[in-house]
Design a protein with these regions (language model features):
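RNA pseudouridine synthases
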Residues: 1-273
């Protein structure tokens, strides 16, 4: 790891670098066998020079200001890199977009790498907020934690429910790559709460609107399958038709009171299924 000269001088001035457990000076010469202690936060250390982002695909910008960019993520695209380290992700595309606009310079000292404020599963499409600076990321993450950001989903499900609206309360446990659902509280299971409204009924499928009170692993997919109405195309959770990508979209977003220009704005994108 490397430490820039300016950071090193600041660390010495603030007594964050010691030689043989004693404060060092700017002109001190090291001797063989000296012990050097660094009391530095991780962000002061650079493991390598940040590479410039590459163009892996375009993004669909729904809204943008000096702090936030709101994009419509397509199904099939990862929100961020997984354990495989895949480069074509929504985060990489956003960073390249801002790099082209000269709003992001990865090689500038202490530059902030634009980041998403929340994520969607790979095969879920819809609205995702991304922050252009650290302040915006902190404020938006706080707003999400305080439930000041409301996401509404739309899904195409197998079957036609007899009810028009339904409050769903169950319990979910993540087991490897699948969510297990229980009707009552059990060890290892977490409460999963959501509201479902039928928007349209066809002969073999329906379109429903879903609002989550909690954000559990595969909550919508597992809960709808638990009710007997799996998402169309969702083989993992019981769909009996042909194998294809399931139909789920975070199509509506409401921003509450937050100290950013995007405050108190609503956004809706069209549904393609």
């Amino acid at each position: 790891m490397t430490l820039t000269k300016s950071m090193m001088y600041k660390a010495i001035r603030n007594k964050k670098i010691k030689v043989n457990r004693k404060r060092c000076t700017y002109d001190q010469k090291l001797q063989e066998g000296d012990s050097i202690l660094l009391f530095l936060p991780y962000e002061f250390l650079e493991t390598r020079q940040k590479a410039c982002p590459v163009n892996t695909g375009s993004i669909d910008v729904v809204y943008e200001d000096d702090d936030i960019v709101l994009v419509n993520k397509p199904a099939g695209l990862l929100s961020q890199s997984d354990e495989k380290g895949l480069q074509d992700t929504l985060v990489n595309r956003i960073q390249y977009y801002l790099y082209q606009k000269k709003e992001y310079d990865p090689q500038r000292e202490n530059s902030f790498a634009p980041a998403i404020c929340h994520r969607l599963d790979k095969n879920t499409s819809g609205l995702i907020l991304a922050a252009k600076n650290a302040r915006a990321l902190r404020l938006m993450n706080d707003a999400i934690s305080c439930h000041k950001v409301r996401k509404v989903y739309c899904a195409k499900i197998e079957g036609t429910p007899l009810w028009d609206t339904k409050e769903v309360l169950c319990y979910i446990k993540k087991q490897e790559t699948k969510a297990l659902v229980a009707a009552e509280a059990k060890p290892g299971y977490k409460e999963a709460h959501m509201h479902v409204k039928v928007l349209k009924r066809q002969k073999e499928y329906s379109i429903v609107q879903i609002f989550l009170e909690t954000g559990r692993f595969h909550q919508i997919r597992a809960s709808m399958a638990y009710l007997g109405y799996p998402l169309c195309g969702d083989i993992k959770y019981g769909y009996k038709g042909s194998r294809k990508s399931y139909s789920l979209c975070a199509y509506h977003l409401e921003i509450g009171d937050v100290d950013l220009p995007i405050a108190n704005k609503d956004f809706t994108i069209p549904i393609s299924f």
